[in-house]
């Protein structure tokens, strides 16, 4: 069985039970990430890689599970997600419940709708992935205890 995807950390969410299914998922997930950051969104790939690395560094039990349009981070449930929003911006979605948002943390309306992701931070440059982003990622992790 393969243990990494896209040259990154080998920690991915609870994969399907059978080895063949895991390998198929890993093949598909790698292609989904490639497709997500292809064409006009190719310039976002360094931001994605930095967010993935930092998200997985929060704790040993954090896992990522790429889908066709997002890359969610899990503990027990989704705690955050990487979403290429435009050709120049990634939205880092966060599961923060009814947390009151300071200016940089944008409410998504998700809490009122019962969605898991309730806030987002706009990421347009590597410098945007700073200590504040890490604090919010760690807060989302802690809320999923």
Predicted regions and their residues:
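Charge-dense, helix-prone N-terminal extensions
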Residues: 1-145
């Amino acid at each position: 069985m393969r243990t990494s995807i896209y040259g990154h950390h080998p920690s991915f969410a609870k994969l399907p039970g059978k080895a063949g299914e895991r390998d198929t998922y890993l093949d598909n997930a790698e292609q989904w990430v490639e497709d997500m950051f292809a064409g006009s969104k190719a310039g976002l790939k360094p931001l994605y890689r930095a967010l993935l690395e930092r998200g997985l560094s929060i704790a040993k039990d954090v896992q990522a599970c790429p889908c066709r349009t997002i890359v969610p981070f899990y503990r027990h449930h989704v705690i955050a997600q990487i979403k290429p929003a435009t050709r120049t911006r990634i939205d880092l979605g966060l599961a923060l419940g009814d947390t009151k948002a300071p200016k940089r943390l944008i409410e998504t309306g998700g809490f009122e709708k019962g969605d898991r992701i309730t806030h987002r931070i706009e990421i347009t440059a590597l410098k945007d992935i700073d200590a504040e982003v890490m604090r919010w990622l760690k807060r989302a992790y802690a809320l999923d205890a």
